[in-house]
C-alpha cells in the first residue's frame, strides 16, 4: 500500500494528446500458452477486500484479471496486496492491511499462510530455511521459518522498513522513516551498519558490478530533496549521489536484465545508464494525464510495464512499451496495480 490517500491529491484529468490503443476486456476462461507469464499485484482499496493478482500471457495477450480467486474457489486475498515473491516453487503474496502472507504452489493454489505480522511489506529469502519480512509499523524485521511458515524471531529496526536486497551474506534494507539504509548480517540476524541515503528511501537494486542503487523520494515539508545514491556493497562507500530538483518525488526504481540500465517513475518513466554522470532531463515515456503507480521491466524481452491507477477507484490500466518508448499493448488489471512479477 502506498498511502495514496495521503500522498496524492486527486486532480482533474485531461485527455492525453495521443490516443491509446483500445483496451481489450479481460476473460476469466482463456487459453494460456507455455510462455513466461506476468503477474500483476493489485492492492485494491483500503479495507475493501478487493486485493487481487492478475495474470498476463505476453505471447497471446490473454488476461485473467483475478487469478488467485480463479485458482482458489473465489477465495479473497484480503486487504491491500503489497508484493509478490517466488522462491523454491512457492509464491508468497504479502497482504499488508490483513497482516499476513499467503503461500501458493506453482499452480497458484493456496497451501499455507504466514500470520502474526503487523503490517508486512516485502518478503526476502535469505537462505533455504529462512526469510525476512519488512514491516510498516512493527519497528522490526520479521524472521520466518520457511519449513513451517512460522515467525521465529525479529530484528529490531525503528521506522518503516521497506525494500530489501541481499549480497555477500548481507541484507540491505531501506527505511522510509529514517535517512539511512541498514545492513543486516544474514547469518546471525543483527544490524551491523548503516549508510545515509536520504529521506523516504524505498526502492533499490543491485547492478552488474555489485553496486547498490537506492532511490529516496525526499520530503517536501522539510525541503529534503529526492536523491539516487550509488553504494559499493562490499565496503559501503558512497560512489555517487544524484540530487533531484526540489518538489520532485521519484519512486519505483527498476533494473533491466543486464543490470546496466535503471528505470524509475517521476511523473513519467525515466531511464538512466549506470555509467551516466547526470540525471536524464526528459522522460522516455511521459505520463500525460495518466497516474503512473507501478513499474516493471520484463527480463525476458526488456519491455516496460506501467500500471496506471487512474483515480485509485477504477480498475488499473496496464501499458506495455518497448525500450524505444513505443506503446505495444494495454489491458485492464485490478484496482491500484502497484507492481509486477515476471516468470523467468
Which functions belong to the PLM regions below?
Residues 1-2, 18:
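N-terminal hydrophobic targeting signals that begin at the initiator methionine
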Residues 2-8:
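Sec-dependent signal peptide recognition
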Residues 14-16:
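C-terminal motif of bacterial Sec signal peptides marking the signal peptidase cleavage site
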Residues 18-344:
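Predominantly soluble domains enriched in secretory-pathway, periplasmic, or organellar proteins
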